[in-house]
């Protein structure tokens, strides 16, 4: 049935000379690794009420008086460490992914890239798809695990700027077999040259209060141990989705529970974030005698500051100070051929929802 639906949609698109638009969304990046550019980016990012979910006046004080006077200078130095000759890694790899997904999907589709913050904007991407005379729209935020601060914020922006009458959304793919298989293949490729003592799956963290707002039920979860398998009671819980992704990848790799762990990075501010924290987890692993560590970042399909600098440089340095021998960061999926095919398959599968 799915194949027939896809075939009918393609025939209709060709007949009417209308393409199917695919909008890939990523978080965003500064235009350059300078203090002014980073300040502009952070101002837009942190002013989003879904990112800092406090009353508007309190958010303004936090952003403009506590963060922007200090953080842009520090962050600009971090961006300078990972900046590529072609530009921001996140933008370079995202554009590469967009191009290759477009080539894979073929002439009946038009693929555009929009950033929630910074350039190219979601509005600009939607205009490109409209100019290409697309009549149907598939929206795919590149956030495997659903959260209000990433996926919901991006989709809110799409709905505010969208003029397409027919739209379908892939709002999460944390357990999508094509995504899990792509991650597993990527890890296997790196195991050819490095055999770790332990695997650490490090995800972007969130303030704990975000889980409560998403419907995570406190009564069944103390957020200290591994989350329970996905069910109706925690299907919208970001933390539970991260643990489920890890379980599925570990199962494909034939890992025991003692061979891998899950932690959360990139916390900001003084509020309580979901645990365990990646930097604290490294300390515990060193105490257990782990020497060779492989770190995988499944919540980042495209390499960015959080993978290349936070893990690839800072965590690497911390691990060496703790007495570890090697910390190997697995690259993000970026434009890996299997991942490109996975996105194409997810897009085609979503056509049956129109």
Swiss-Prot record:
Q: Which organism is it from?
A: Coxiella burnetii (strain CbuK_Q154)
Please verify whether the record's keywords include Electron transport.
no
Q: What does the record give as the reaction this protein catalyses? A: heme b + 2 H(+) = protoporphyrin IX + Fe(2+)
The cross-references to CDD domains, in alphabetical order and at most eight, read: Ferrochelatase_C, Ferrochelatase_N
Q: Which GO terms describe its cellular component?
A: cytoplasm
Iron as a keyword of this entry, yes or no, is yes
User: What's the top EC group for this one?
Assistant: lyase
What family does the Swiss-Prot or TrEMBL record give for this protein? Belongs to the ferrochelatase family.
Put simply, this protein is called: Ferrochelatase
**PROSITE patterns recorded for this chain?**
FERROCHELATASE
